[in-house]
Curated annotation (Swiss-Prot):
Record keywords, A-Z: Cell membrane, Cytoplasm, Membrane, Phosphoprotein
Biased amino acid composition, Low complexity: 412-423
Residue(s) carrying Phosphotyrosine: Y263, Y290, Y441, Y632
Protein name: GRB2-associated-binding protein 2
Residue numbers of Phosphothreonine PTMs: T262, T275, T284, T328, T382, T388, T405
Name of the gene encoding the protein in the UniProt record: Gab2
Amino acid sequence: MSGGGGDDVVCTGWLRKSPPEKKLRRYAWKKRWFILRSGRMSGDPDVLEYYKNEHSKKPLRIINLNFCEQVDAGLTFNKKELQDSFVFDIKTSERTFYLVAETEADMNKWVQSICQICGFNQAEESTDSLRNLSSASHGPRSSPAEFSSSQHLLRERKSSAPSHSSQPTLFTFEPPMTSHMQPALSTSAPQEYLYLHQCISRRTENSRSASFSQGTRQKSDTAVQKLAQSNGHCINGVSNQVHGFYSLPKPSRHNTEFKDSTYDLPRSLASHGHTKSSLTGSETDNEDVYTFKMPSNTLCREFGDLLVDNMDVPTTPLSAYQIPRTFTLDKNHNAMTVATSGDSAIAPPPRPPKPSQAETPRWGSPQQKPPIGENSRSVAATIPRRNTLPAMDNSRLHRASSCETYEYPTRGSGESASWSAESPGKTAVGRSDSASSDENYVPMNPGSSTLLAMERAGDNSQSAYIPMGPGPHHFDPLGYPSTALPIHRGPSRGSEIQPPPVNRNLKPDRKAKPTPLDLRNNTVIDELPFKSPVTKSWSRINHTFNSSSSQYCRPISTQSITSTDSGDSEENYVPMQNPVSASPVPSGTNSPAPRKSTGSVDYLALDFQPGSPSPHRKPSTSSVTSDEKVDYVQVDKEKTQALQNTMQEWTDVRQSSEPSKGAKL
């Protein structure tokens, strides 16, 4: 090791060195022989050198500790072969060197030696935020097995913290990992360390990561279970839609008609088809095939709360919990019985006129809605489209109209939970070959359905949102049925209804752009060692590394080094600026040269002006010190001759009219 015999060798040993940050995955971590040299006695800079082996004479690289900014000890690394090692880093202005020691004593020895030479103090953020953790967890770590257990725990936080965060964040664990690691921690760490690592905030967060919160979920389950127990066959469509989220009993009736699918429309309501043709003989003969009882008003109100409050349940094709609408129709289209509760003594609305054609996209005059009670609440209901209108009673015809979106009362008719679960577009495709099937298509996205309804309606804002009060049902001018609205709590005025926010990044065909960024961040965390609660950091108070701050922060022995370096850099600085400053002569003549390099540049630039250099040379030389005059003479003699030769060649080529300018010295 003939790398400077007079240097003070502070520390030597084997360390495993990291490749550059961009090559951590492709290149291996090489084991090198490191020597820490102090220039206290010789006046040389403090350096950290590493060699290929102990007997090498030429170092592979010399790390100048004058540019060292920070040292971190006790880093965590997920590389398999380095999980049980002790990692520390040296951050310089050019590169961050990650070094791996075999034992904790070696790491502490290197870190203390480097910090002592550089004059580092422990960072305030490390002492404030990690005072308890550092004393409790970093001290007792004496074996690789214990460090492996803690490092195994630290790997859980890699997706939530950056690789170079200035202040390590306290991490939480998944409940299985916490229970698995609890015995190891309880035997090797103090009690307060266990409290920090076994905090239960992650458990509540894990419960919140489900589709809905506990409070909403319990409320929703209670409402659905009550509704299912009261009237199981009434929620056939809901059991098909939300069977993944709620445990609902299977319907005991109509299994053969619906076949456990929300797109099987009751045959009496098939759109674009004659009612006689859509009804079979067995269905029309039995008067009770499509008749069922309604739940009580209390249960209907709870079910309305479930639909309005719990927005985490997946949306259905019509943005509502849709239950197959069931009616009882006879062969002659003269009766359509709808089973109601005790509140069925309401006056029927006026009978609309019979349409002129059997197959029309829409039909004539609007119909009235029965009055609503004071305490009744409404939800958005969608009734399947019917184009063939038989001769019915007024009260029955009120419920067999085209596919409309309106506020259906909860108490007034007792039919609030009996909604349509079928998308009219799907039904038209499956059961009818009518040419106007596109008119019945309803998008599955709640946001897009609302926008589609508003676009079709034009300026008619009332076609999209219908007020609660009694009034005619609206149809859009193109003959399309108004699309189903998202689930809302029925307000007293239609102007208060607002559609829910739509996250369009959740569409299946949409490619989210942040995905590559997340993957890149994860790979960086996997590749680079990161800080942990046991990490200690040392750095300077002032991180601006100019000449004055370096002399202030460095030890006294290095002040002579910085002064000699500044003198050497001055000589090298003047020749580099000569070619640049030779062209802007007028701006250079007006500057007085307050600095060393500026004065020398002005002096050299004025040599080539005929008649003007002598008046300007005297004030520029008089404004600087005598030591700098010596530098001017030494540099001017060489560089001025070179610049004169260049100018002479330029004048010869251009055939300048002033050939004497290049010959002047």
